[in-house]
Amino acid sequence: RFKKIRRLGALPGLTSKRPRSGSDLKNQLRSGKRSQYRIRLEEKQKLRFHYGLTERQLLKYVHIAGKAKGSTGRVLLQLLEMRLDNILFRLGMASTIPGARQLVNHRHILVNGRIVDIPSYRCKPQDIITTKDKERSKVLIQNYIASSSHEELPNHLTIDPLQYKGLVNQIIDRKWVGLKINELLVVEYYSRQT
């Protein structure tokens, strides 16, 4: 993990750790001239590690985004941001995306009153995300909410920390994506692979 954040920069979905301020400069000095391929590859890896996806999963999302209307890069980010594990992370109900994935896999999360145990479940506007009515589930979420660094909540989400309830208001806007990334380079990377 730490090698990844040292090489790629801050990945809030993977870990709350940040690279040291001088490590960026050392990396650039050591690496010399970066080729266009390497720049595209690093952007793709940043996206992959932040959202915790395998190469195959990311490729699937790129294909879906390519077939959809609108900018492929923007649609790709919307698809990734609207995953249930990512929404839990952005709501502050989990400290990292892998932590959110574990909550979903262990059946602690309900979407619109139904248990969902698929982390890649695509949330839609007006979805209500709550915890199971069990004490253990509520304690887990309560600890995460209490320890979460109260960053500004994106405008497409609303949370009620007392009822352990989150609401998806709308599909995310590009400016609220929690990662500094050039998604066009990721799309370019895959378009050159085929």
From Swiss-Prot:
GO cellular component terms attached to this protein's record: chloroplast; small ribosomal subunit
Compartments, as annotated in UniProt: Plastid, Chloroplast
Keyword Zinc-finger belongs to the record: no
One term of GO molecular function: rRNA binding
A Pfam family this chain is assigned to: S4
Highest taxon of source: Eukaryota
Location of the S4 RNA-binding domain: 82-143
InterPro entries linked to this entry: Ribosomal_uS4, Ribosomal_uS4_bac-type, Ribosomal_uS4_CS, Ribosomal_uS4_N, S4_RNA-bd, S4_RNA-bd_sf
One Gene Ontology term from the biological process aspect of the record: ribosomal small subunit biogenesis
Keyword Aminoacyl-tRNA synthetase: no
Swiss-Prot/TrEMBL keywords: Chloroplast, Plastid, Ribonucleoprotein, Ribosomal protein, RNA-binding, rRNA-binding
Family classification: Belongs to the universal ribosomal protein uS4 family.
PANTHER family: 30S 40S RIBOSOMAL PROTEIN, SMALL RIBOSOMAL SUBUNIT PROTEIN US4M
Known partners and oligomeric status: Part of the 30S ribosomal subunit. Contacts protein S5. The interaction surface between S4 and S5 is involved in control of translational fidelity.
Role summary: One of the primary rRNA binding proteins, it binds directly to 16S rRNA where it nucleates assembly of the body of the 30S subunit.
The protein's name: Small ribosomal subunit protein uS4c
Organism encoding this protein: Trimezia steyermarkii (Steyermark's trimezia)
Source species taxonomy: Eukaryota, Viridiplantae, Streptophyta, Embryophyta, Tracheophyta
